[in-house]
Swiss-Prot record:
The modification N6-(pyridoxal phosphate)lysine is found at residue 358. It comes from Xenopus laevis. This is Alanine aminotransferase 2. It comes from the Eukaryota. InterPro entries: ALAT1/2-like, Aminotransferase_I/II_large, PyrdxlP-dep_Trfase, PyrdxlP-dep_Trfase_major, PyrdxlP-dep_Trfase_small. GO terms for molecular function: L-alanine:2-oxoglutarate aminotransferase activity; pyridoxal phosphate binding. Its EC number is 2.6.1.2. It is an enzyme of class 2 (transferase). Pathway: Amino-acid degradation; L-alanine degradation via transaminase pathway; pyruvate from L-alanine: step 1/1. Belongs to the class-I pyridoxal-phosphate-dependent aminotransferase family. Alanine aminotransferase subfamily. The keyword Transferase applies. Keywords: Aminotransferase, Pyridoxal phosphate, Transferase. Gene3D superfamilies: 1.10.287.1970, Aspartate Aminotransferase, domain 1, Type I PLP-dependent aspartate aminotransferase-like (Major domain).
Amino acid sequence: MSILRGSLRGVLAPNASVVFRSRLPPQLTSALLCPLRSLSGTPLAEPDGKVTRKMSENGTCNRILTLDSMNPCIQKVEYAVRGPIVIRAVELEKELQQGVKKPFTEVIKANIGDAHAMGQKPVTFLRQVSAICLYPELMNDNKFPEDVKQKAARILQACGGHSIGAYSASQGIEVIRQDVAKYIERRDGGILSDPNNIYLSTGASDSIVTMLKLLVSGQGKSRTGVMIPIPQYPLYSAALAELDAVQVNYYLDEENCWALDINELRRALAEARKHCDPKVLCIINPGNPTGQVQSRKCIEDVIRFAAEENLFLMADEVYQDNVYAKGCAFHSFKKVLFEMGPKYSETLELASFHSTSKGYMGECGFRGGYMEVINMDPAVKQQLTKLVSVRLCPPVPGQVLLDVIVNPPKPGEPSYKQFISEKQAVLNNLAEKARLTEEILNQAPGIRCNPVQGAMYSFPRIHIPEKAIKLAQAEGQAPDMFFCMKLLEETGICVVPGSGFGQREGTHHFRMTILPPTDKLKSLLERLKDFHQKFMDEYS
């Protein structure tokens, strides 16, 4: 301790401050900054008898938050849509910018349903109203049509201080919730919607997680089980991992265009009841990542099943505007529920979700959405309102955009023709790209792609040779991750492995969006087809 003594002015008393005369070795500095801790790492007692934490090998105080001490549920969370493939894609983009030579000139991110990032232009009316709400001085600009100004003025009038910079009510701005209710009534053929049952949210994801928080409870065999489709959107598995709920998988029927089979629901439920308490059934319609659109009969069967088995029904309907295939139509679970009569409409508990991020608008960055709850216990509804109040309110610009989506221009109004033209152009283009994706992928030996009936994705099944499977396993990778990483490194095409969404054992898939511009999508599909053939030749 001679170095220590020689480096100090004064003595170490229990409450004395330490003054340095000269720079000490780092280990000693750390020791001095962590009073009364042993240089050997042995815990020492403070004057009050409390034991301090050990020092780490590098002489610094041990961290409170480590992988061992953190919430273990967080470590179980996985989100493939922004996982290792996407991280590598970002690295490749930077390498290209630095002039590193690659077999491609750009990275095409076909991994996520972000329409504007893929080049889709905003719908004029949506942005005009948003612009005036953000900067009300634009009311004086004669470039903006009168219906745009009227819409913006109505929204601003409902905001605190007539500014979207003010907090809103936690459930969302009342006039916007009223407009959402009217939209639902129009969509569902006049079935009433109560604005008090509507909760605006930060995209649909926020309200889905909020609802799951309310539903999850119990321990051991009484722990809440949540039934989710496989393949599924990874938000669900991630949220269930974070909440330490039990994930109950039911498999969609790939041989029947990813249809939902009631017998499979019964199998999954019976199996789950052996080890948990299944209380929730989640449906994604149109499907993500699978792109199927459920028939009305299927929805009726699901409602009967949920009622018979006393399950809370969650209907993720964010792709309700994205239906392309002939003979397919979107039917909301609420509409079908009420048309089935009081036996179901007065008893079945339902939460349904919608978003500004998908559809024809694709406004992901605004983070707007809503949830409608049906037949919720009033006491629980009070708890739901309390829970959303903790986060103060959803982003007000997102609420504004949602209002414009659910309350668009009407025939005869100045903006109507342009609005309808732009909306239909986007949906027609998506329908053509859905057809194109199925057609080109099915030309490749070893790739099978079901029809993309709706949503924004294709989820083709790929054959992976046994040699590649063994190599992937040796590297600790899922075979489709191995395939997708090779695809990225050799072509610059970024897609998501099917293993990130769940799939039947022994099958391999990937998810890709249909959002790139048509010419780029054609090129992407042809390159993907060629790569798969090369991959098959190399590993067969």
